[in-house]
């Protein structure tokens, strides 16, 4: 079985090398343009995607954020594209192709179509049909694999500057929709995100936010658990447990003595999970007006030493 799998793998890589050469030929001789294949793909996606964003390009093409950013800036400098701030969310910018960009794109498309036709001209109709069917089958089979990979959840233990605004918005949205908290909670989030962040774990699936948890340094031996949230689309899959496992393991490795968190008594969903990991209530405040509700704050502690 192992030998057969290795044989398939070798054939797969051999085909990849062959098709990479075909793509290189297309890019060098067919498109006959100063753009690389990746640049051409990015221009194609911007042209054909309504309200395209840099994040959408990253997700669709599987490209690094910095790489996409450099190409977008280059295109902007060359007057191929322009950005427009979203009316709904000022943090987001949509990318559009300029008239110059449209002219260049259409020329690339025309040239590509002409030269692909010339490439196929030496292949008879029967073989062309077989080729098209084989391509469709390859696409269908590999799409299943890619779809399965995209549904997997990965957890990263670092954060980017734009992640902070995303976490604030996810927290605000969840507590507003599920618990009716008002905008004073948003103000609280924005103020406290300037705290001494020790670590943040962010769960993602197919480029989509799935959950998060973080730590804020309280003193040399104590950290506070913050920003614990699992997106509604990913609940019931054990993600909350995984996030807390990462957090507790990190705290043990760093030799912290204590983890604590503040929550409110109405947070029924997370309480069993906190108890499972050994957190215990250490302080309960009197019910008071908070974030547009009457809430009872609780402090939970986990002793590690």
UniProtKB/Swiss-Prot annotation:
SMART domains: HTH_MARR. Residues 153-303 form the N-acetyltransferase domain. Gene3D superfamilies: 3.40.630.30, Winged helix-like DNA-binding domain superfamily/Winged helix DNA-binding domain. The keyword DNA-binding applies. Transmembrane segments: none annotated. Its EC number is 2.3.1.-. Pfam families: Acetyltransf_1, MarR. SUPFAM superfamilies: Acyl-CoA N-acyltransferases (Nat), Winged helix' DNA-binding domain. The keyword Acyltransferase applies. Residues 54-77 bind DNA. Residues 1-140 form the HTH marR-type domain. Disulfide bonds: none annotated. Keywords: Acyltransferase, DNA-binding, Transcription, Transcription regulation, Transferase. One of its GO terms (molecular function) is N-acetyltransferase activity. It comes from the Bacteria. InterPro entries: Acyl_CoA_acyltransferase, GNAT_dom, HTH_MarR-typ, NAT_camello-type, WH-like_DNA-bd_sf, WH_DNA-bd_sf. Putative DNA-binding acetyltransferase. This is Putative HTH-type DNA-binding domain-containing acetyltransferase YbfA. The gene is ybfA.
């Amino acid at each position: 079985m192992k030998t057969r799998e290795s044989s398939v793998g070798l054939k797969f890589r051999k085909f990849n090398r062959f098709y990479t050469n075909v793509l290189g030929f297309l890019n060098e001789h067919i498109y006959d343009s100063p753009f690389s294949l990746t640049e051409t793909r990015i221009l194609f996606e911007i042209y054909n995607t309504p309200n395209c964003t840099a994040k959408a390009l990253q997700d669709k093409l599987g490209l690094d954020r910095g790489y996409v950013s450099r190409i977008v800036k280059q295109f902007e400098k060359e007057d191929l594209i322009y950005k427009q701030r979203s009316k709904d969310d000022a943090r987001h910018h949509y990318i559009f192709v300029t008239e110059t960009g449209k002219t260049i794109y259409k020329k690339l498309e025309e040239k590509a179509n002409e030269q692909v036709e010339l490439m196929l001209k030496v292949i008879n109709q029967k073989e062309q049909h077989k080729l098209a069917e084989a391509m469709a089958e390859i696409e269908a089979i590999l799409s299943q694999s890619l779809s399965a990979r995209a549904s997997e959840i990965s957890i990263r233990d670092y954060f980017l500057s734009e992640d902070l605004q995303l976490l604030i918005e996810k927290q605000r949205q969840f507590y507003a929709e599920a618990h009716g908290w008002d905008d004073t909670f948003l103000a609280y989030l924005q103020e406290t995100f300037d705290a001494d962040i020790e670590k943040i774990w962010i769960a993602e699936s197919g480029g989509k936010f799935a959950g998060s948890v973080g730590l804020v340094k309280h003193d040399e031996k104590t950290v506070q658990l913050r920003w614990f949230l699992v997106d509604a689309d990913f609940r019931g899959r054990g993600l909350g447990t995984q996030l807390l496992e990462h957090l507790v393991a990190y705290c043990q490795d760093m030799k912290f003595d204590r983890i604590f968190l503040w929550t409110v008594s109405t947070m029924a969903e997370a309480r069993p999970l906190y108890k499972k990991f050994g957190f215990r209530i250490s302080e309960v405040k009197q019910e008071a007006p908070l974030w547009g509700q009457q809430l009872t704050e609780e402090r939970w502690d986990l002793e590690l030493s």
